[in-house]
Amino acid sequence: MKKVLLVDDSATILMMQKMALKTTPYQVITANNGEDGVKKAIAEKPDLILMDVIMPKMTGFEACRRLRQEEATKTIPIIMVTTRGEPINVEEGFQSGCTDYVTKPIDTFELLNKLRDQLGE
């Protein structure tokens, strides 16, 4: 079973993302800030990470950069899911190492398609 790590400081967003993934075969892991997300990614080695950008303790951009420096996590697909859709933010996301960048609110169908695409399904 493939694992998906959801990283967002909003309990509501985490709940909505978990509900969207409920009908999928993925095991879902959650973290409520970037620092915890990095720790869980290193420990759990998920197959994919959905990462918010603006979070306490560590931004999604910084978390992404750190994950790209770690041998165990440097190739894990990371999809940034954020309200920050300005071109400068999108560019920073890709420079930090994300593999895809989508803006909230995101349609459940679109989210699932992005996951399947990144997981090669």
Predicted regions and their residues:
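Charged docking surfaces used in two-component/phosphorelay signaling
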Residues: 15-23, 113
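Short hydrophobic/Thr-rich beta-strand motif most characteristic of the beta2 strand and flanking loop
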Residues: 25-32, 40, 102
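C-terminal output helix
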Residues: 106-115
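Active-site beta3 strand of CheY-like receiver
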Residues: 44-50
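Receiver (REC) domain active-site loop signature in two-component systems and cognate sites
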Residues: 55
